[in-house]
From Swiss-Prot:
Record protein name field: Uroporphyrinogen decarboxylase
Source organism of the structure: Roseobacter denitrificans (strain ATCC 33942 / OCh 114) (Erythrobacter sp. (strain OCh 114))
InterPro entries: UROD/MetE-like_sf (IPR038071), Uroporphyrinogen_deCO2ase_HemE (IPR006361), Uroporphyrinogen_deCOase (IPR000257)
Top-level taxonomic group: Bacteria
GO MF annotations in UniProt: uroporphyrinogen decarboxylase activity
Length: 344
């Protein structure tokens, strides 16, 4: 039964003797089987839009490690592509998009009710996964948070300081907020379709939340997360939402109450002890082992994993990394982490 799934129990506020575990980017280039399937697909976007192959790479880490959750294999930039932005990937450099910096650029975007024409293969991937995943494994869908997605749409690429997005916000706030509103509404529909296809949990990734300060954090990180969560809860009241305002620092405090999310995912810039005292008091937390341990391994990996489990043992906790696993990670270190979490 779904109610017995450990991830869902933690998200409902239950403190378990052993925390459930999954890993951001658990389907990825550190796994040889992923690289083989990626080669079969031809390129990254072709893999995302091929339901059978996307389901296969989602299932690979479940078969290998027995994680408590599978996260849909996709990308946060599929939504901007569905809204009409050009999207391509440059080998060794990452994503590129056509930029949205003028009203004319914005006017070329598609309305939200047209996104399914592009995103239907993603929903089919979800349906395949619900059929093929082990009964005890929770299926997580996801999307990027509006601020983070906007930073890519404005700059046309990832940037170290999100300066182009901050510049548009300051110079043409009306256009900036119109773009954020379009992304917010698109995110609500995109996540709702994932849920209708079978996702049991959804996660909102705000990878660049840490670059928002003060009133901007409230307005462009908290408020969109609250709006999306409220809309999801109105349509799907039983579906938990995880929020990840990466590098929010003190902004993690009160995030769950301000947004309505069921769980706050933590990066590893905050200590587990601090987060237990300041964030876990409001409910479930997820995290927050440094992904570098998946590369270096050794006793430090075991010790830090056990320390995080201990720090969060007084409340609901889902074990995860503080950032996505990197391509240079050792697959054996992932198993060592899992064994340490599960007390083996």
């Amino acid at each position: 039964m779904a109610a017995a799934k450990t991830i869902l129990r933690s998200l409902a506020g239950e403190t378990l003797p052993t925390p459930p575990i999954w890993m951001m980017r658990q389907a990825g280039r550190y796994l040889p089987e992923y690289k083989a399937t990626r080669a079969q697909a031809g390129d990254f976007l072709s893999l995302c839009y091929n339901p059978e192959l996307a389901a296969e790479v989602t299932l690979q880490p479940i078969r290998r490690y027995g994680f408590d959750a599978a996260i849909l294999f996709a990308d946060i930039l599929l939504l901007p592509q569905a809204l009409g932005a050009d999207l391509w990937f440059v080998t060794g450099e990452g994503p590129r998009l056509s930029t949205i910096t003028t009203q004319a650029d914005f006017d070329k975007l598609k309305p939200v009710d047209e996104i399914d024409a592009v995103l239907n293969p993603i929903y089919e991937t979800v349906r395949i996964l619900r059929r093929e995943l082990p009964q005890e494994t929770t299926l997580i869908g996801f999307a990027g948070a509006p601020w983070t997605v906007a930073t890519y749409m404005i700059a046309g690429r990832g940037t170290p300081d999100q300066a182009p997005a901050h510049a548009l916000k300051d110079e043409n706030r009306e256009l900036f907020e119109a773009l954020l509103a379009r992304i917010t509404q698109g995110t609500i529909e995109y996540l709702s379709r994932q849920i209708e296809a079978g996702a049991e949990v959804v996660k909102i990734f705000d990878s660049w939340a840490g670059s928002l300060k003060g009133a901007d954090f409230q307005r462009y990180a908290l408020e969109p997360a609250r709006e999306i969560t409220a809309a999801i809860k109105a349509r799907h009241p039983d579906i938990p939402v995880i929020g990840f305002p990466r590098e929010a620092g003190d902004g993690y405090i009160g995030f769950a109450k301000a947004t309505g999310v069921d769980c706050v995912a933590l990066d590893n810039s905050v200590s587990a002890e601090w987060a237990a005292a300041n964030v876990q008091v409001d409910g479930c937390v997820q995290g927050n082992l440094a992904s570098s341990h998946m590369v270096t391994g050794g006793q430090a990996l075991i010790d830090e994993t056990r320390a995080i489990v201990k720090a969060f043992s007084g409340g609901p906790h889902i074990f995860n990394l503080g950032h996505g696993i990197t391509p240079d990670a050792d697959p054996d270190n992932v198993q060592r982490m899992i064994d340490a979490v599960r007390g083996q």
